[in-house]
């Protein structure tokens, strides 16, 4: 007898080997129809998998995250099936699952067109409607290589050639199409109903620019028609909020071919950048951080000691001077340790908190660059806390409270907390890992935060907490982090004198709140659809006259406001152009200014202004003093 234990603790007995599908059918016809896969331990299995021993089994459906990932993976194969039917000369390569969908790379003699995508999607729907079974078989490695070479699928043969010779290779067939894959897959193509192909882009084979350029077809797939439509609607809204589009429309920045992956900030954009930086500088000052500044270029020897030269060199910009090799820093941590090492440090100095707005450079592939979100030169709100193991928990508690306040001020209230724990290959004792992971968890619990564990996703030298924002469209952005690191202080020989008079290694906590300022500003623009709150807006209000007769009055009002709000650095635009008032109002409204003030003869006589507030329309006539009070409160409270 084989005993299967289900998630609710109940057991089912079978006289001999049984498939996942048969177990699902024994529970009920509804589950049998909905079953996409099974899960034993951490392993996902096809519904055709034969169970030969007692186990705990979960049936995976499209209600599970794993089920949705399975749908997307299988839809990628369905795309390849359709492409091979439409374009038999195309060669298939790889087709993984990505956030919200999948892609598949093809080698073909000409670029795919938008009409080709329409044809592919139509053929996919036809193949799905046939509800063909998805069947698995296993071949010896060399037989699999010969099989795919015989089909003319040389990329697949190359992939398999990289697998050890004594291993078997699994293949999945649906109809006339068979592909290399570890699996699992949905039991039949009829499970794949709600998908859409999104775009085609270029991608080098194996990500190497020296190899052939392939065509990458992107798609999305969901468990229901409603979920697919909701996602497509979100994409439409995201397109309207695209920070690259807003950067042009609001005259904030641009990216130029003369310096790929770096930002040309325009006056208004640089004002926004400085406002974010100055806010974070006040955060440093008010929370016990000492601001420091390290050099841009550091010697190769230092990067060899930290391990970056071996593991990260391809992503570093390297230069040479007087027969010495240097690299532009991709991160600030080594510089902070060098500063820490100047002079003897005592346990009384700890925790010691350094912060830096350090400009970093990373040689990102050109295909991965994206506006100001993914760049090669960026400024990091980088901080490092030197402390003892016993101080980790209190530092996590303080840092989490700080993260929450900063995100709230910028308009984010939904934060997801994740704790990444030790990977299988790690350094340090199990006791030190237990202590660090416990300190992070207790710090989060003391902050009142619900969090999820990310088993095995910590760095090889220490665990970390990730702080992920959820924006107005429900998208997630991982910005904040705090990482426990006993390794780099060891590598660079950082020490402090303990209470016992002996020398000890400090623990280093790498921490960032907004991360890259450039990326965070991109997130801010998309969160607020360009309509930044008054305290952040590059221009907070425009003051307009109706005719020349009110010009002097507008100048007087502007001077009064600037004087009254000098402590807040009011950013006011005085527009006295001889244009129709409707034209001027429309122009400034398109720039998403928080306030537009208009002064005509009536307002001048009353010593007042007509106020228009973004999102609220005409607020009527208001005294100048009343408006000063209103905007001062809005800026100072970050409303």
Swiss-Prot record:
Catalytic activity field: tRNA(Thr) + L-threonine + ATP = L-threonyl-tRNA(Thr) + AMP + diphosphate + H(+)
Keywords: Aminoacyl-tRNA synthetase, ATP-binding, Cytoplasm, Ligase, Metal-binding, Nucleotide-binding, Protein biosynthesis, RNA-binding, tRNA-binding, Zinc
Domain TGS: 1-61
Cofactor(s) demanded: Zn(2+)
GO biological process: threonyl-tRNA aminoacylation
Pfam families attached to this UniProt entry: HGTP_anticodon, TGS, tRNA-synt_2b, tRNA_SAD
Cofactor binding mode and count: Binds 1 zinc ion per subunit.
Keyword Cytoplasm: yes
Assembly notes: Homodimer.
NCBIfam families documented for this protein: thrS
Function: Catalyzes the attachment of threonine to tRNA(Thr) in a two-step reaction: L-threonine is first activated by ATP to form Thr-AMP and then transferred to the acceptor end of tRNA(Thr). Also edits incorrectly charged L-seryl-tRNA(Thr).
Name of the protein described by the UniProt record: Threonine--tRNA ligase
Organism name: Verminephrobacter eiseniae (strain EF01-2)
Name of the gene encoding the protein in the UniProt record: thrS
